[in-house]
Amino acid sequence: MAYQEDLHPLLGKAVEHINRVMVGKRDIAILSLAALLAKGHVLLEDVPGVGKTMMVRALAKSIGADFKRIQFTPDLLPSDVTGVSIYNAKTMEFEYRPGPIMGNIVLADEINRTSPKTQSALLEAMEEGSVTVDGHTMQLADPFFVMATQNPVEYEGTYPLPEAQLDRFLFKLRMGYPSFNEELDVLSLQEKSHPIETLEPVIAKEDFIFLQREVQNVRADDSIKEYIVEIVQKTRQHPSVQLGVSPRGSIALMKAAQAYALLHHRDYVIPDDIQYLAPFTLPHRMMLHPEAKFEGIQAEAIVREIMSAVKVPVQRSAVR
């Protein structure tokens, strides 16, 4: 659970707004907003029926953004994601018909149920910020955010994302089942209708884009950068790790921390930000040795072990 600290007035409203729909998932709402602020993307892994789709819809509605959904299936084609060129007999020219990737907030539902080729079409668009169809390049919407969902790998009919593709996601999150009381609240909220239907924007899309630009003005001093690098480099030296976190992971953790600091109405990063975010930012970028997997060792546990061994820089601390 995140440490207790006041949120940015505007962004705090969005968090509470999402929490009206997603009972008991405040931390997931905060992390999703942080990823969107950092211009990153989120991979949400969990069993069906825990509210992954509602989370993305609530996020989109809270900032007045255009929401698109892609339901990934084994027969989905790359053009079903990126769009196609259609011949117009009247103009005798080909016209681009946009795919769902052209939305602001895109739900890539069950991404591990489609072929690697179609997965790549989405992931390359996420990386480049554009799509190319028949030689023509189209820029993606601004803001642009993908929340991809996947079922756990033990489910049948899945195509696991390779490590190089997982690296494209800022965070990998799990929602989990609600508690007894939370599930009671869900039933009460949906007794007559779903609260998502009456959700209104609390931040204008243009204001959110401005806040995204403000993230780069959040300071991460040298001690914070050294702290990040030391943690990341130790993932490459750990005996259970076959492939450690790349420099892209270091950058991702710093950007995530800057966004998280802004969300908490600060213009500087503190060690608490790194400690809280590292378990969501680093483990999915690591490949463990087969014997470590066989022994049940988890990448997240390795990250926590490393953080417990790395000296924390002395800085201003958040109020807990």
From Swiss-Prot:
Pfam families in the cross-refs: AAA_3, AAA_lid_2
SUPFAM superfamilies, per the entry: P-loop containing nucleoside triphosphate hydrolases (SSF52540)
Keywords associated with the record: ATP-binding, Nucleotide-binding
InterPro entries: ATPase_AAA-3, CbbQ/NirQ/NorQ/GpvN, ChlI/MoxR_AAA_lid, P-loop_NTPase
Molecular function in Gene Ontology: ATP binding; ATP hydrolysis activity
Protein's UniProt keywords contain ATP-binding: yes
Keyword Cell cycle found: no
Gene3D superfamilies tied to this protein: Magnesium chelatase subunit I, C-Terminal domain (1.10.8.80), P-loop containing nucleotide triphosphate hydrolases (3.40.50.300)
Residues holding ATP: D46, V47, P48, G49, V50, G51, K52, T53
Record-stated family: Belongs to the MoxR family.
Protein name: Uncharacterized protein YeaC
Chain's gene name: yeaC
